[in-house]
Amino acid sequence: MSSCVVTTSCFYTISDSSIRLKSPKLLNLSNQQRRRSLRSRGGLKVEAYYGLKTPPYPLDALEPYMSRRTLEVHWGKHHRGYVDNLNKQLGKDDRLYGYTMEELIKATYNNGNPLPEFNNAAQVYNHDFFWESMQPGGGDTPQKGVLEQIDKDFGSFTNFREKFTNAALTQFGSGWVWLVLKREERRLEVVKTSNAINPLVWDDIPIICVDVWEHSYYLDYKNDRAKYINTFLNHLVSWNAAMSRMARAEAFVNLGEPNIPIA
């Protein structure tokens, strides 16, 4: 008999339903100890894998600004592909079992010398964060708290929009644009990242992001990235998610907690 135990971003399949693992803390163990901890629990075989999260709305909920067809291809094929490929990689090497997604990304970034698992792990996280950075009826201006912080750090919401848009349009090739909270400076900043890289690797706290890989907008906007970004800011971005993330980010920064909060 087998059971499935769910932890943050990770699922564990265990060959005995009487055994339950909850948020295993294996990071302080050596690789050899971690393998022994996972594989030698009374002869049980433990397998870890990451699941494909569903966007927090129906696939047609963002229409007409982002079509159901885009979600079917982007989430259903591209995003699923990153999850599947990551699981295949982890299945070949159990040294990374037990990591949360955030821990996995930081570990596999390897101080700028990425391990093979990094790209797929980061893309799984990036896409989860992107879907949760949008909502039906989104756009417009942020709520008071977020707006005040944007005004403080960028001078005005208009200045923020211009900087965010410019970052998206000048990101050459594939990548992402993020609004992040810088931990040390305790201020908001717009950053752009190439390919799969995300702000977690620099210990920044992401607040919102937009995907500027071509597959994220080509079905709806062809090669008109400017129209896609303008639509994202006017009709799609979830300032509700941003407000929630900001509140948690500020709490983590003020309390000095080591973990990065996500939506």
Curated annotation (Swiss-Prot):
Question: Which InterPro entries does the record associate with it?
Answer: Mn/Fe_SOD, Mn/Fe_SOD_BS, Mn/Fe_SOD_C, Mn/Fe_SOD_N, Mn/Fe_SOD_N_sf, SOD_C_sf
Q: How is the cofactor bound?
A: Binds 1 Fe cation per subunit.
Q: Which residues does the annotated transit peptide occupy?
A: 1-41
Q: What does it catalyze?
A: 2 superoxide + 2 H(+) = H2O2 + O2
Gene this protein is translated from: FSD3
Q: Where does Fe cation bind?
A: 74, 127, 211, 215
Give the UniProt family note: Belongs to the iron/manganese superoxide dismutase family.
The GO terms this record gives for MF are: metal ion binding; superoxide dismutase activity
What's the source species' lineage? Answer: Eukaryota, Viridiplantae, Streptophyta, Embryophyta, Tracheophyta
Keyword Nuclease on entry: no
Identify the EC number(s).
1.15.1.1
Main localization of the protein described in the UniProt heading: plastid
Q: Which UniProt keywords apply?
A: Chloroplast, Iron, Metal-binding, Oxidoreductase, Plastid, Thylakoid, Transit peptide
Q: Does the keyword Plastid apply?
A: yes
* Cofactors, names only: Fe cation
Record's subunit section: Homodimer. Heterodimer with FSD2. Interacts with MRL7.
Q: What is the originating organism of this protein?
A: Arabidopsis thaliana (Mouse-ear cress)
Q: What happens when the gene is disrupted?
A: Pale green phenotype. Abnormal plastids, highly vacuolated and without internal membrane structures like thylakoids.
Question: Can you list the GO cellular component terms from the UniProt entry?
Answer: chloroplast; chloroplast nucleoid; chloroplast thylakoid; plastid nucleoid; thylakoid
Tell me what this protein is called.
Superoxide dismutase [Fe] 3, chloroplastic
